[in-house]
Swiss-Prot record:
InterPro entries: Alpha_mannosyltransferase, Nucleotide-diphossugar_trans. It comes from Candida albicans (strain SC5314 / ATCC MYA-2876). GO terms for biological process: mannan biosynthetic process; protein mannosylation. Glycans are attached at residue 657. The keyword Transmembrane applies. Residues 75-125 are annotated as: Disordered. Keywords: Glycoprotein, Golgi apparatus, Membrane, Signal-anchor, Transferase, Transmembrane, Transmembrane helix. Gene3D superfamilies: Spore Coat Polysaccharide Biosynthesis Protein SpsA, Chain A (3.90.550.10). Its EC number is 2.4.1.-. The keyword Coiled coil does not apply. Belongs to the MNN1/MNT family. The gene is MNN21. Residues 1-17 are cytoplasmic. This is Alpha-1,2-mannosyltransferase MNN21. Its main location: Golgi.
Length: 660
């Protein structure tokens, strides 16, 4: 019996010898990788992904897969600089030569800009070849996506029919009057910052706002007729199956491709796993390395506008969408509408999430309201004519809410006409009007299940925006565009919305100590924490002022009451985070040539990690390690670009301990 058992054991070992050896070998590798991963983690870490300095830590599985299947691109080798102790600037033997070559390069670029018509015929041939190549790549990518998602083709076909009907309504609702541009004088509306504390004699009352854009009776009647038609004919709901799940949408194209990629890189690094769709408006703005190689690895994909709007395999000459020319501000509403997601967070390409926005979809205020908008700096200047056109009753008896940007709150008012003079009340404090302040559309959270019709109406406003609706919303003041259309459409249709009460914060720095503040971006706050903060503040106000102990305990239990909502989005809109352009235009240098932090040293306290350093680390990863090939950097030598990124990274690292 024992001999038989021994024989079987030897037989098993001979037959499975190589499997046994391979198993031991793989086990040793995995144990080594686990040990390496844990030994490289810092002792104290605020997050599994980003630590307090903004350093990205790969997950265990990511470390294993990268070790077993390393990226094909060759890592960029960082050069160790020589440092001048007097000014912390890098110096080298060829520093003078590099300045001369840089000057020559700038002269060549300027000369090239002065001669835009040279080699026109060859450029047109290249453009035609690029068009055909991009079209082929787009179709191949879509076919691949369709194979992985069996119901996608049916969904697209549903969309083609639905959108054609929608654009038929838009076309038939075209205003019969020409552009609205009649003003009594060259004077335009005072573009005032919303400031509750300012001693401003200009009240944006109905009387004041009626002094600018003028409509004749014929124009007013025609606008009312077309608006009524579109409101009565637009559907409330989309076809079943056209939209599903939650996702994030960007509008890219051209120079915005790079900014979108940088934002997506940050989004993934802060732990957001939501799928992403990148809207490409024009075929010449499609970049194969971005759409075919990089984005799929980040669980994102490009969607080409025309192929989502009309069937590319059919003759679309009679399509109603073809009767419109799309550009600029119309892209945002189109991007939301053409995306496959039911619930959408729309982000500008230069808008970078500081933390994961994933929880916003599953909690209030979004779950209850279906639309979340964020405030902008300015007072609302919407013409009283708009409310007449949209058939909105702006009360002369009751007020709606009054906004206080210092406290970050709306106060409900219920004052009857007899106790106030309407000429002394802002129009947009009256019940029924669109509330102050204006909206900032760098981020927008919307449900197409509850707000499809407002979205369609907003698209209508944007299609006829430059000629008709932008003058009604902004009356010729600065900053007119799509930002007013989403909330205006929602108010017009009587849908719910939530406007974040916490006022945006300006982010920037002082180039000269004691000098003027130079704004470089805007910080927008977490709406979930904003709503929680409002509710807790109401509860706190009910605690008797004498009961200090109860007040203290309440604050300890609710940290958000003490700290306030946190910054969720950094809209890095001026200057854009293009590392080479920042250097060329000296945006990251002070008057003496020393490097500066764009958003100042206080960002580490505000965000919880070194946000600015982390963006430049993302640039290094994308451009120097992963070797992303984008048109925006095609005229820049990669080694020069990466040297600049590394030099600025070293500066940012050297200033991480400065927090004031």
């Amino acid at each position: 019996m024992f001999q038989q058992l021994t024989y079987r054991l030897r037989l098993f070992r001979r037959r499975h010898k190589y499997i046994f050896i391979n198993s031991i070998f793989l086990s040793v590798i995995i144990i080594f990788l686990i040990y390496s991963y844990w030994s490289n983690l810092p002792a104290e870490d605020n997050s599994a992904i980003i630590n307090e300095k903004g350093t990205y830590h790969r997950s265990l599985w990511e470390s294993i897969t990268m070790a077993l299947f390393p990226p094909k691109t060759k890592p960029f080798e960082e050069k160790k600089p020589q440092v001048n102790p007097n000014n912390n600037q890098e110096v080298g033997v060829e520093s003078g030569a590099s300045e001369i070559s840089q000057h020559k390069q700038q002269q060549q670029q300027q000369q090239h800009a002065k001669e835009p018509t040279t080699k026109t015929s060859s450029k047109s041939l290249v453009s035609d070849e690029a068009y055909q190549l991009n079209l082929k790549l787009i179709n191949e990518q879509q076919e691949k996506y369709n194979r992985l998602h069996p119901f996608e083709q049916k969904r697209l076909q549903q969309g083609y029919e639905f959108f054609d009907n929608i654009f038929k309504i838009f076309y038939q609702a075209k205003p019969s009057v020409s552009q609205l541009n009649t003003y009594p004088s060259k004077k335009r509306i005072y573009h005032a910052r919303f400031d509750s504390l300012a001693d401003d004699d200009t009240i944006f009352s109905e009387k004041y706002l009626s002094q600018f854009l003028q409509l004749s009776n014929e124009e007013l009647a025609a606008m009312k007729k077309s608006h009524k038609y579109v409101v009565e004919n637009l559907p409330e709901d989309a076809p079943d199956g056209l939209y599903k799940k939650n996702g994030i949408v960007y509008v890219a194209g051209g120079s915005f491709n790079w900014l979108t990629l940088l934002s997506i890189k940050s989004l993934r690094a802060v732990g957001c796993h939501l799928p992403i769709e990148v809207f490409i408006p024009k075929i010449e703005e499609y970049e194969s390395d971005l759409c075919n190689r990089i984005l799929p690895e980040l669980d994102a994909r490009c969607i080409y506008m025309k192929n989502q709007l009309m069937n590319p395999n059919k003759d679309n000459s009679d399509s109603f969408a073809n009767k419109f020319e799309f550009k600029g501000y119309q892209y945002k509403a189109l991007a939301i509408l053409l995306s496959s997601f039911e619930n959408v967070l729309l982000l500008d390409s230069d808008n970078i999430p500081a933390h994961s926005p994933e929880e916003l979809f599953e909690n209030d205020p979004f779950k209850s309201y279906g639309l979340v908008v964020w405030p902008d700096y300015w007072k609302r200047a919407t013409s009283p004519y708009y409310y007449n056109i949209a058939d909105i009753d702006v009360s002369e008896k009751y007020l709606g809410s009054k906004y206080n940007e210092v406290e970050g709150q709306y106060t409900d008012l219920s004052v009857e006409k007899g106790s106030v003079e309407l000429d002394k009340i802002p129009l947009h404090q009256r019940l029924g009007s669109i509330p102050d302040p204006t909206s900032e559309s760098g981020q927008l959270l919307i449900s197409k299940k509850t707000h499809l019709k407002p979205l369609l109406l907003a698209l209508y406003y944007n299609l006829y925006g430059p000629s008709h609706y932008y003058p009604l919303f902004s009356q010729g003041s600065d900053g007119e565009g799509d930002k007013e259309t989403f909330l205006a459409a929602t108010v017009t249709l009587g849908k719910r919305y939530y406007q974040v009460a916490k006022f945006l914060v300006s982010l920037g720095h002082f180039k000269v100590p004691g000098g003027d503040f130079e704004g470089c971006g805007m910080g927008q706050f977490d709406p979930q924490q904003d709503l929680e903060y409002i509710k807790l503040r109401e509860q706190y106000a009910k605690i008797p002022e004498k009961d200090k102990e109860k007040q203290h305990k309440f604050k300890l239990q609710h940290q958000v009451l003490e700290k306030g909502p946190e910054i969720l989005f950094v809209h890095a809109n001026f200057p854009k985070l293009n590392p080479w352009k920042l250097k060329q235009e000296k945006k990251i240098f002070d008057a003496k040539g020393n490097r500066v932090r764009l958003y100042g040293p206080g960002m580490i306290k505000r965000i919880g990690y070194d946000f600015e350093w982390f963006q430049w680390e993302g640039m290094k990863y994308l451009l120097c390690i992963y070797d992303v090939n984008l048109q925006i950097f095609q005229d820049v030598k990669k080694s020069d670009l990466c040297d600049e990124i590394l030099e600025h990274l070293r500066f940012l690292e050297s200033t991480q301990n400065i927090t004031d």
